[in-house]
From Swiss-Prot:
The lineage of its organism: Eukaryota, Viridiplantae, Streptophyta, Embryophyta, Tracheophyta. It is a multi-pass membrane protein. It comes from Pteridium aquilinum subsp. aquilinum (Bracken fern). This is CASP-like protein 4C1. Residues 1-21 are annotated as: Disordered. Keywords: Cell membrane, Membrane, Transmembrane, Transmembrane helix. Disulfide bonds: none annotated. Residues 1-54, 123-144, 211-221 are cytoplasmic. It is found in: Cell membrane. Its main location: membrane.
Length: 221
């Protein structure tokens, strides 16, 4: 006669003891049971949730769009002063070091964001990274941080120059202010504002890439 213990094991096929008798390891949530519900696929410790990966890709797209728009506006920023004495001179973005700095920073961030968009699409479509995982995490976070500081410093310096031009503390060619070159000043200010937008989005990207890096360092791949 079977003992109550063995009888209980026979009535409860989900216990580990039953799995040991028939040679099949059965887990409590039905994993490994034929016809049982499939367990959800677990994410690797060093990976973000799919929604977070999509959000990161969206931030890359916004960074690219804002930095490209700022780059184009600054690169085409040229105007002719309107002086009452009849002396007209052309003012260009290359006349100011800080504006050249903004253009260079936006160009670098634009190219970097474009490359990151390609890498992000590859990961979403293929499910794997182009570079080794450890290198990819450090690459993304390091460049996000570095380029965020780069474009922020460029915008900060250019904002001071734009303000001083408006207040006539700095004169264009030593004699003109924004009253005589209003279109030039306005385009420069718009370009700086868009560059600040690019900084905001790449800074948010660095938060996600930093979280992914810390998660990978603590929990492993």
């Amino acid at each position: 006669m079977d003992s109550p213990e063995s009888s209980d094991r026979g009535l409860n096929p989900m216990t580990p003891d039953h799995g040991g008798h028939n040679g099949k390891v059965v887990h409590y949530f039905g994993q490994g049971v034929e016809g049982g519900p499939a367990s959800p696929r677990k994410l690797g410790h060093g990976h973000l949730h799919p929604k977070a990966n999509t959000a990161l890709l969206l931030l890359r797209l916004l960074t690219f769009a804002f930095s490209l728009a700022s780059l184009v506006i600054m690169a085409t920023n040229s105007a002719t002063t309107t002086a009452t004495a009849g002396r007209h001179r052309t003012v260009n973005w290359v006349d100011f070091d800080t504006y050249r700095y903004v253009l260079a920073a936006c160009a670098i961030v634009c190219l970097y964001s474009f490359a990151e968009i390609g890498l992000g699409l590859w990961y979403l479509l293929k499910g794997r990274m182009v570079m080794p995982e450890s290198m990819a995490h450090w690459f993304d976070f390091g460049h996000d941080q570095g380029f965020a500081y780069l474009i922020f410093s460029a915008c900060s310096g250019a904002t001071a120059v734009a303000h001083n031009l408006r207040e006539r503390h700095i004169l264009i060619h030593g004699m003109y202010g924004c009253d005589e070159a209003n279109s030039f000043c306005m385009k420069a200010e718009i370009s700086i504002g868009l560059a600040f937008g690019a900084f905001l989005f790449i800074a948010l990207s660095s938060l996600l890439s930093g979280y992914r890096l810390v998660k990978w360092l603590i929990l492993g791949p």
